[in-house]
């Protein structure tokens, strides 16, 4: 360990974040390595180590001969201060070596509020911020993750973007880099070759021009780059990598358990949900393989909790059979199975009993909207009756805590829809009174609302976010309407949601704003301890750009959007059709009921695994 680090660690919070040495961390002999990869997560250790995608790609890269992938996380403020004071560059956990010793610096970016953390980590690593300043092959700075479906705000800082699922594409990129270095290519030669790989977007190979009103006038590829870059997917989930020997963190993290991915994609088609669109098509992992991974992961790590994870886990066809298969093993080892947010329309007592075999926790449902009219607009095909029946089932089975998630500011929302949220909570309370076997325990109902953020590649990508003032008015309206003492109301901070809406649909000009805000001190914007909207507004003002242009403006369907060179596999025509259906309050059936022709099926030969 670096002597400077030894002196620093006693002075910072949670020093275990920075020392590595965890069980299952990969260590290799440097003399046998020709390519080193710094896999960076632009958030804290606790958040990054909870990310399944990072665990998967860490394993994929470390299975390559001659390649060593190491982890790097954004330091907390106290650690950053100590690093800068000691003039100690950012380092990787496995070896402790500075990031400048690495060939490839790869960022996993799932959230727009992490953009300034990317700049901060590059600076802490003593790596030039701008891609144009990094003229050699080393380091090659790449980024992937769902936030990269619109990478334009950070286009000036990233050499290339990996779109979609990275298990196969990451290997191809690393091998291409090794070829480039072995044959003495220039960086431009490498970037031009990378752009020919399916799923690779190279920002510097696209010229973007603007109209006088600030909208994009043209996106022009050059040097043979494709006009449209389509994401990559894993075709067969049974052949895809799963991190059975996952790293066991040395300090508590957010998701400190085995995360078992059952399938990718979603059959439901909620019109606001970016993940539901960009992870299409549906591809399932076989039940037997899921069970095998569960047993082996628990045996190896000692974890006693397993999350059965997918976008809509209860839509996994053999879910009940999987729980049956795992029942004996989990009972013997005192392992609990848990699910993330459940759908109210397919929740059952049978499923609940299997979950209750372990530690019985509260249940979470996401109705998203307070009235059926608005649920139809967003294609959340769940009725109030279905929600209440699920709650009755849960309360009768001994559950006494329910969390309900909603959004405020959805397209066409009215005050009646907002007040409908309070009505839903009251009806859930009434369902408890009707169904609970032991009323002495009481009940806890938590209503949480977030501010709707329109996202690229969704049916609502053209919509405006409501103003901050209007959002806060609706929050207050709902606060006053929730009068039951057993109902707790939590709402999301408005400032971060506003900036998220700006960055999510931003263009390349926001790169100047990002850098200006970072130089003013922005770095861990996903954390309220460090976020300052005033700092960002000053940066916008200095750069002569209006954030409301990005967040609060309805786009014409004819407008060329900044991310128009990127395809998630879902066609623009389908997204427009879904938008029109929304305004007509017409729902679209789920993919299992009827193929709606979104286009994603063409990524898997024409037929989805629904």
Where are these regions (language model features)?
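Radical SAM enzyme core and accessory elements
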Residues: 1-27, 31, 37-39, 483-610
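N-terminal [4Fe-4S]-dependent radical SAM core
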Residues: 8-38, 45-46, 203, 209, ...
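Conserved SAM/AdoMet-binding glycine-rich loop
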Residues: 40, 113, 295-403, 407-446, ...
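Glycine-rich beta-alpha loop elements in corrinoid/cobalamin-binding modules
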Residues: 75-222, 459-507, 515-529
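Flexible glycine/acidic-rich beta-alpha junction loops that bind and position SAM and/or redox cofactors
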Residues: 77-78, 153, 207-211, 317-318, ...
């Amino acid at each position: 360990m670096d002597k400077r680090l030894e002196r620093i660690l006693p002075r910072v919070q949670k020093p275990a974040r920075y020392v590595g040495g965890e069980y299952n961390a990969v260590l290799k002999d440097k003399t046998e390595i020709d390519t080193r990869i710094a896999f960076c997560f632009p958030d804290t250790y606790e958040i990054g180590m909870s990310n399944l995608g990072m665990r998967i790609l860490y394993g994929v890269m470390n299975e390559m001969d001659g390649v060593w992938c190491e982890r790097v996380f954004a330091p907390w403020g106290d650690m950053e201060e100590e690093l800068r004071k000691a003039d100690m560059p950012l380092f990787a956990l496995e070896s402790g070596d500075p990031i400048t010793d690495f060939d490839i610096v790869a960022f996993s970016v799932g959230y727009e509020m992490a953009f300034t953390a990317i700049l901060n980590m590059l600076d802490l690593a003593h790596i030039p911020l701008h891609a144009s300043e990094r003229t050699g092959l080393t380091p090659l700075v790449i980024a992937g993750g769902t936030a990269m479906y619109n990478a334009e705000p950070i286009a000036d800082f990233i050499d290339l973007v990996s779109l979609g699922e990275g298990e196969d594409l990451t290997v191809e990129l690393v091998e291409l880099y090794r070829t480039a270095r072995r044959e003495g290519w220039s960086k431009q030669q490498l970037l031009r070759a990378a752009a020919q790989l399916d799923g690779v977007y190279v920002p510097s190979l696209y010229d973007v021009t603007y109209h006088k009103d600030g909208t994009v006038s043209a996106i022009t590829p050059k040097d043979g780059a494709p006009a449209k870059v389509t994401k990559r997917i894993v075709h067969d989930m049974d052949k895809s990598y799963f991190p059975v020997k996952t790293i066991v963190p040395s300090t508590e993290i957010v998701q400190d358990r085995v995360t078992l991915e059952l399938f990718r994609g979603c059959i439901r088609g909620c019109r606001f949900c970016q993940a539901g669109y960009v992870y299409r098509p549906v591809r399932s992992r076989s039940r037997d393989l899921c069970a095998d991974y569960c047993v082996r992961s628990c045996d190896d790590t000692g974890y006693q909790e397993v999350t059965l994870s997918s976008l809509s886990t209860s839509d996994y066809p053999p879910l009940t059979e999987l729980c049956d298969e795992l029942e004996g093993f989990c009972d013997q080892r005192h392992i609990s199975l848990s699910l993330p947010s459940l759908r109210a329309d397919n929740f059952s007592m049978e499923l609940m009993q299997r979950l209750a075999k372990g530690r019985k926790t509260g249940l979470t449902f996401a109705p998203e909207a307070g009235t059926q009219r608005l649920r139809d607009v967003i294609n959340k095909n769940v009725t109030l009756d279905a929600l209440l029946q699920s709650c009755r089932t849960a309360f009768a089975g001994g559950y006494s805590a329910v969390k309900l998630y909603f959004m405020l500011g959805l397209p066409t929302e009215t005050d009646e829809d907002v007040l409908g949220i309070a009505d839903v909570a009251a009806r859930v309370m009434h369902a408890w009174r009707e169904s609970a076997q032991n009323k002495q325990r009481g009940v806890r109902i938590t209503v949480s609302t977030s501010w709707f953020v329109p996202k690229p590649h969704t049916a609502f990508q053209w919509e405006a976010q409501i103003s901050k003032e209007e959002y806060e008015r609706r929050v207050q309206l709902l606060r006053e309407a929730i009068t039951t003492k057993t109902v707790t109301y939590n709402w999301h901070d408005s400032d971060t949601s506003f900036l998220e809406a700006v960055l999510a649909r931003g263009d390349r000009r926001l790169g100047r704003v990002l850098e200006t805000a970072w130089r003013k001190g922005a770095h861990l914007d996903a954390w309220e301890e460090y976020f300052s909207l005033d700092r960002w507004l000053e940066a916008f003002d200095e750069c002569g750009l209006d954030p409301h242009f990005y967040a609060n403006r309805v786009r014409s369907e004819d407008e060329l959007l900044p991310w128009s060179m990127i395809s998630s596999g879902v066609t623009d025509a389908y997204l427009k059709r879904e938008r029109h259906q929304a305004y007509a309050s017409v729902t679209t059936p789920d993919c299992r009921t009827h193929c709606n022709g979104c286009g994603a099926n063409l990524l898997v030969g024409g037929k989805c695994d629904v």
